[in-house]
Amino acid sequence: MKSIYSHARVRTLAAAAMAIAATFNAHAGFFIPKDTTMVMGMITPTESMTETAFGITRDTSVALGVSTMTNAARSYRWQMVHAQATKLVGRVFNEDGIGNAYVFAGPLAARAVEARGYGRDFDGTRYGAHAGVWLDYETRRYYGRASWHGYKTSAFAWNETITQAMVAPYLADYEDVATFVGVQAKRRTDEPQTEVTPYLRLFKKTWWIDAGVSVNRAHRRDVFINLMHTF
């Protein structure tokens, strides 16, 4: 009986993990189950993104998205269009939770937008690539994530590192609304401070909402919102 219960519990955790696999900064690294479509949007004062992804196999998804990036000093701003393939390269189950490892990469096109008082840092459209790695571990009570995402064109190179840690104040079944509270730490190229953002996550089956406010000096009171829906 214990063995049957344990296997059922792992299957439930696996279903939950695939439905709510963490993102985004947000953003890149989402894994989408086969034949599932995901639409998401993320916005902060220095970043925004909209993306649509589709799961083509059990361990591979593809995506198209549009994003905007601004540095903390607001001295330059880029708009990008990207395509992406995400591959699940490792998954570890135990009685309490699931660990996942993803890699992702794809082409991008970027152009500079005039920043107030600074102008553009390059002209025309520049083409390049982006890639990254995403590691996470989840139980019904705890969630942790570490990711790296790099962008490269002839005009700029940009890296972003994110760590997240969350805890659920109560245990929720997969059919119910679940709540996590936690903190995100993000470090971006050429920025002297790590952006620290306490935030709240709500999710249920096919939808997900993140909301938080940054507290470090360079990003103080910057609001972070991330929305996701699968169908």
Protein language model regions, located:
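Cleavable N-terminal export/targeting peptides
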Residues: M1-I32
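Outer-membrane pore/translocation modules
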Residues: A28-T197, W207, V215
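Outer-membrane beta-barrel "beta-signal"
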Residues: A83-A85, L200, H219-F231
